[in-house]
Amino acid sequence: MGRFSNADGPGDDADEREVTPALTVGEGDIDASLRPRSLGEFIGQPRVREQLQLVLEGAKNRGGTPDHILLSGPPGLGKTSLAMIIAAELGSSLRVTSGPALERAGDLAAMLSNLIEGDVLFIDEIHRIARPAEEMLYLAMEDFRVDVVVGKGPGATSIPLEVAPFTLVGATTRSGALTGPLRDRFGFTAHMDFYEPAELERVLARSAGILGIELGAEAGAEIARRSRGTPRIANRLLRRVRDYAEVRADGVITRDIAKYALEVYDVDELGLDRLDRAVLSALTRSFGGGPVGVSTLAVAVGEEATTVEEVCEPFLVRAGMIARTPRGRVATAQAWKHLGMTPPAGAGGLGQVGLFE
């Protein structure tokens, strides 16, 4: 269990967690410097890479644009990197926007009108695009044209505008939130899975080389297994461990240095942080293992219900620590054991398989 207290509280705000898969403030430039530039450099997701290579090579051989591409999966797995790689492999320009930024049809029309033939348009969080913009996107994806409405009321007229043939790459963390008509217009859909520890070790070795960090193999394995199967988290933890190694040691990251550093940053051997352990502690100590509703659990740890449900719970469920039941959240036998406690009778049937076991 390491040197963590079972009674750890939630600590820092959820947005400041070292193990959040989302980009944090000021992280964008560093994240960009570590991005792979080609499919050959991209580590992990072998099926997606193979399928994408076929799609892109086929389009290049035909001298046309590939089908529109939808990339789905949890944050931090490389969807934006793949969009950049797609444009690079095609020798095309990449235009970047996001679903929340496209609030009106006019916003999208302006972007589409500036595309040149062969451009790649990347829309991140495409499930959050506003309905008027989405409906305009249908026609652009299918027929490479848009209808722009001029005026209001009975006097309004629709002016058709041609759009240069382009490839849309959409990224989403919630593919189920896409409307059927939008989803059906993507010719190729790829789902990205969490990484295995061995793949994360390769990611870390590559990043260490780029950043000039001396990282031992055992140290890389130590960081990888605490990274929640997510390259972005692995790279962030690598930078935190580097800071520790430079300040408290000689700058070389050994396994012991990695362990000590990650304990300082409250990331335990399974990748749980203070907030995760606070949720498990409340569930086991305050509510006897459950079942308990997420709102009640959130009050117990001093967080918003959405934070517990959307930030903590997905990983705890995936790691086999919490089970969702019709009556509420229940701690599994593995959760009790991780906190150094004896699970009560009946907890053993609620999933004891860990994330990478």
UniProtKB/Swiss-Prot annotation:
Residues 196-266 are annotated as: Small ATPAse domain (RuvB-S). SUPFAM superfamilies: P-loop containing nucleoside triphosphate hydrolases (SSF52540), Winged helix' DNA-binding domain (SSF46785). Residues 1-195 are annotated as: Large ATPase domain (RuvB-L). It is found in: Cytoplasm. GO terms for biological process: DNA recombination; DNA repair. InterPro entries: AAA+_ATPase (IPR003593), AAA_lid_4 (IPR041445), DNA_helicase_Holl-junc_RuvB (IPR004605), P-loop_NTPase (IPR027417), RuvB-like_N (IPR008824), RuvB_C (IPR008823), WH-like_DNA-bd_sf (IPR036388), WH_DNA-bd_sf (IPR036390). ATP binds at L34, R35, G76, K79, T80, S81, E142, D143, F144, R185, Y195, R232. Signal peptide: none annotated. It comes from the Bacteria. It catalyses: ATP + H2O = ADP + phosphate + H(+). Residues 269-357 are annotated as: Head domain (RuvB-H). DNA binds at R324, R329. GO terms for cellular component: cytoplasm; Holliday junction resolvase complex. One of its GO terms (molecular function) is ATP binding. SMART domains: AAA. The keyword DNA damage applies. Its EC number is 3.6.4.-. Keywords: ATP-binding, Cytoplasm, DNA damage, DNA recombination, DNA repair, DNA-binding, Hydrolase, Nucleotide-binding. Residues 1-27 are annotated as: Disordered. The RuvA-RuvB-RuvC complex processes Holliday junction (HJ) DNA during genetic recombination and DNA repair, while the RuvA-RuvB complex plays an important role in the rescue of blocked DNA replication forks via replication fork reversal (RFR). RuvA specifically binds to HJ cruciform DNA, conferring on it an open structure. The RuvB hexamer acts as an ATP-dependent pump, pulling dsDNA into and through the RuvAB complex. RuvB forms 2 homohexamers on either side of HJ DNA bound by 1 or 2 RuvA tetramers; 4 subunits per hexamer contact DNA at a time. Homohexamer. Forms an RuvA(8)-RuvB(12)-Holliday junction (HJ) complex. HJ DNA is sandwiched between 2 RuvA tetramers; dsDNA enters through RuvA and exits via RuvB. An RuvB hexamer assembles on each DNA strand where it exits the tetramer. Each RuvB hexamer is contacted by two RuvA subunits (via domain III) on 2 adjacent RuvB subunits; this complex drives branch migration. In the full resolvosome a probable DNA-RuvA(4)-RuvB(12)-RuvC(2) complex forms which resolves the HJ. Belongs to the RuvB family. Has 3 domains, the large (RuvB-L) and small ATPase (RuvB-S) domains and the C-terminal head (RuvB-H) domain. The head domain binds DNA, while the ATPase domains jointly bind ATP, ADP or are empty depending on the state of the subunit in the translocation cycle. During a single DNA translocation step the structure of each domain remains the same, but their relative positions change. This is Holliday junction branch migration complex subunit RuvB. It comes from Mycolicibacterium gilvum (strain PYR-GCK) (Mycobacterium gilvum (strain PYR-GCK)).
